[in-house]
Amino acid sequence: MARELILKLGKKITDRVDVKLGMTKLDENSPEYYGLASVVTDEMAELALAMKVRVPTTPAEIGKKVGKDPVYVEQLFDQMSMIGLLEYNWENADHHKQWTLPIFVPGSAELMNMNLQQVETHPEIAQFFERMSFLPLTKITCMVPPGGAGVGMHVIPVEKAIPATNESVDVEHISHWLKKYEGHIGVGYCSCRNAMRIQGEGCGELQDELCIAVGQFADYCRETGKGRDITYEEAMEIIQRAEDNGYVHQITNIDGEDKIFAICNCALGSCFALRTSQLFNTPNMSASAYRAHVDAEKCVACGKCAEVCPAGAAKLGQKLCTKTGPVVYPKQPLPDDNHWGEHMWSPNYKDDNQKQCHESGTAPCKTACPAHIAVQGYINLAAQGRYLDALKLIKQDNPFPAVCGSICNRRCEEACTRGDVDRAVAIDEIKKFVAEQELQADKRYIPKVITHRGIADPYPEKIAIIGAGPASLSCAYYLANMGYENVTVFDKNEVPGGMLTLGIPSFRLEKDVVNAEIEVLREMGVHFQCGVEIGKDLTIDQLREQGYKGFYLAIGAQKSAPIGVPGEELSGVYGGVDFLRRVNLGKKPRIGKKCAVIGGGNVAMDVCRTAIRLGAKDTYIIYRRSQAEMPADAEEVAEAMEEGVQFRFLSAPAEILGENGKVKALKVEIMELGEPDAKGRRKPVGTGKFETIEVTSVIGAIGQRVDLGHIAPEAMAFNRNGTVQADGVTYQTAQPDIFAGGDVVTGPKFAIDAIAAGREGAISLHRYVHEGQSLTLARDPREFYELDKKQAVVPIDCFDAPARQTVAHDASKAKTFSNDRITFTEAQVKAEASRCLGCGVSVVDQNKCIGCGLCTTRCEFDAIHLTRDVPEASRMYRTEDKMKAILPHMVKRAAKLTIKDIKEKCAK
């Protein structure tokens, strides 16, 4: 049965108009009731009912009202303050201590959640806070004028983003507030993040010390154990850390002009204050006086502004005109111009606001790259000679640019709009030039750790990475970059790198390049245990016993697929990746003078060229389709041909012939092409005609398989081809603490695909090892769309650009294990960069923009700025006076909509 005093207290404090007017009656299921009833006694409720909301009072005054001893009242007041029902107040002539009964939000609902032990014991308090930041606002948000009218919180911009020449006012500057309250500044845990964690809906933005208390509220937090004192300098460090993490600064907005009690650093996925504008699509509830604007001439569509924009206002579009004119982008409807209701809300705003690209498309290079590197951006920086900045930009999305500069399959170049004019920009060669700047230890770029807690307080959770290939290394890199100090990479091989080190020959990827980029991980604090086979030397259960909280399985597909013909057991028959591994470990497999390589992919090209370097005089590629169907990179095929490899197209192995247990010859069947298969390639069909080729070795390079070795298969589910089943978004396997990525999940793909998967694995592991975090909520989907190149109009001056630069070769390194490709010169890089058409651009919808300024912190091109478009948004009101601001705006809006309705009716 409901407690009567709690019902009365809930009605007294609530901001719900329907409850205040008696239209809705509270009961046990009302948040006002269950939130208070969980921790407030009837004795406390009796005292609170004798108080006025937001009016300071003393124990003596309340004791007199209720007929209680003031000493007893003060003791209860202290308990009520610890709970979070009351606040302290010293604003009086002699600064004696008073107590205040605050509103629920912002007020006691937050304070009750800041008592961490209390909310763990009573998780219903978290739901109480969430509901009380929602229910009172459902009918009113569309009527609120710019500035918020004293309702809740208000965005305050990144201070560096406010133009120096702008007519800003003091209340728009964070430094103003921190200087005003210097000596009374504190910090505490974020109540929104904590409430969402308790409800299992955290988004990876942890409830660490991020919310700054000022004035007497800071003193209250210290005295009640909800926070601690900090200096002005410490507060500014928190502000900077928040900006690094992409958190929005907000100030309380319920106390009138030039008065606040908190500066919060808010995350879209958790913040109930940001929800007031984002869920209801009513930016006036949050927005500052500023709006972001893009200088399209300077913008290079790196997309970093879109990544950080909490409102989904900044998105990637295209700079190139279409045949019908410039692309016109949609604007978010606003309540001042439209009838509003739930049909205009955005219930999925946490996910929708993560979308970074207009469906009409953006630069094809960024879209095509699996890691969605800011190609247009780093090309622009390289053109300016800002090579370190270019490297920093690349490594935000790809920790191994030097590796990829040597071996990437260049999907960005395949998609390049320039390729429809003449030839694609040599993107990979520019990246390689930029990346090789840091191969020298003294020039190495170590990224700044971006953690919620600060560099001095890293995450202690232990995470095991199984395998040391590109997916594993990428995952480890991003975890270290987040601030994890106990990331350990385990690999059964004696050296890290996986296929980068052992599966790709040095003449394509020099091992010093791989080692230099791995060394960056060591300097970031990643630990390596090589020569340790998980499942054999150490089991996953043993690692769990050692305190490991999460695992990333990325052991690749390092087992050669069998050729599947008689004679495969003969001496001189090798699997392609096994052969390359032995060579990379310094061994020299005996292949004789005549070697046949079965297959038509990149591994086959690596194998045949390696065979030449081991002394084979006659090397054959045996491929069952024609050259047109060959999946290997055309450039690698050409290089193999130049080195003397003989290609036998439309030939399939039938039998390996031997003598005295050794390979003597290869029998092949002549094929012809039939109907296309599911991938569009014509199927090879046997003709029944055979030929025999005299060879001394046969190397099968027809595919790779996953080999889990001694890792217990019962721990996970598998696909028919032996790959591990993992969620397509989170990469979580059937074992909740094991995530997987790279070739072990997809089957053989390219390094850049594995690198992209590693980043997603790190995001999932970060969320998983912290209790109450959703793996999917408010997660960046990394979805980009390519602009319609058929409709794009390229600028006339693009035809005056230089021809594509060509790679030179060092003749002295030909047919050796050294890479004979010569990196572009600086002049070549700048000439090649000038060929970029600059297809993409960022576009800001000012109707959605809340003027936080985070976009400006990410732009390296001076292309996005804030302007003070809505100065009235800096007007501050007391919550008691909110209707003085809302009513005039409501009347004006109603008149505007009436006129609009009449015009629309007349038009019909």
Q: What are these regions, as identified by a protein language model?
A:
Residues K68, W99, Q250-I263, L279-V308, ...:
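Ferredoxin-like iron-sulfur electron-transfer modules
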Residues S81-N92, A314-K315, I864:
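A short, conserved structural fragment
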Residues H95-L135, I886:
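Short, amphipathic alpha-helical interaction segments positioned at domain boundaries
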Residues A311-P364, I379, V425-I427, K431-I463, ...:
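Flanking helices and flexible, charged tails adjoining ferredoxin-like Fe-S electron-transfer domains
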Residues I373-Q376, A382-A383, A424-D428, E461, ...:
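Beta1-alpha1 glycine-rich phosphate/pyrophosphate-binding loop at the start
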Residues V434-D457, A516-K536, S560-L614, N719-A734:
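Glycine-rich dinucleotide-binding loop and its adjacent helix/turn
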Residues E569-K593, P676-P748:
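FAD-site-proximal beta/loop scaffold in flavoenzymes
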Residues V744-G772:
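A conserved FAD-binding loop/helix module that cradles the flavin
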